[in-house]
């Protein structure tokens, strides 16, 4: 059994893999619009961004919902034969990705691999007219992933 010692602490100043904050939790669901409606009306989350057929996304719909410092992403596939569709059919609605804000995506990616993590997406930058985002992903438990942002 794993035992954690109270005196065994990672020194923040020396650990290059320090997580600064949680960025988001992404749920893969059967109906993103319905899930967004629920989170807005039942739990008080506000929609802050979306991607769907209306924005040119022909693979899936996603809604970013925010309340205070909490940010969730609700995504649903248009096709059951896609990766997202197959995952949703197998597992039902649930968490797919946990986004972690780190100081340096490249360093966090490399250090996680050095510590035994399985890399999925190497450091990648995406951008559009609204800005850019650098991220990398690693495999964790089951089919859930962690995304360094």
Question: Each predicted region: which residue ranges?
Answer:
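Conserved oxyanion/phosphate-binding beta-strand-loop segments in alpha/beta enzyme cores
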Residues: 1-10, 63-81, 145-149
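Core segments of cupin and vicinal oxygen chelate
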Residues: 3-7, 17-71, 114, 123-129, ...
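Catalytic micro-motifs at enzyme active sites that drive phosphoryl/nucleotidyl and oxygen chemistry
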Residues: 12, 51-54, 83-88, 99, ...
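Vicinal oxygen chelate
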Residues: 20-30, 63-64, 83-110, 115, ...
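C-terminal catalytic ATP-binding subdomain
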Residues: 134-149
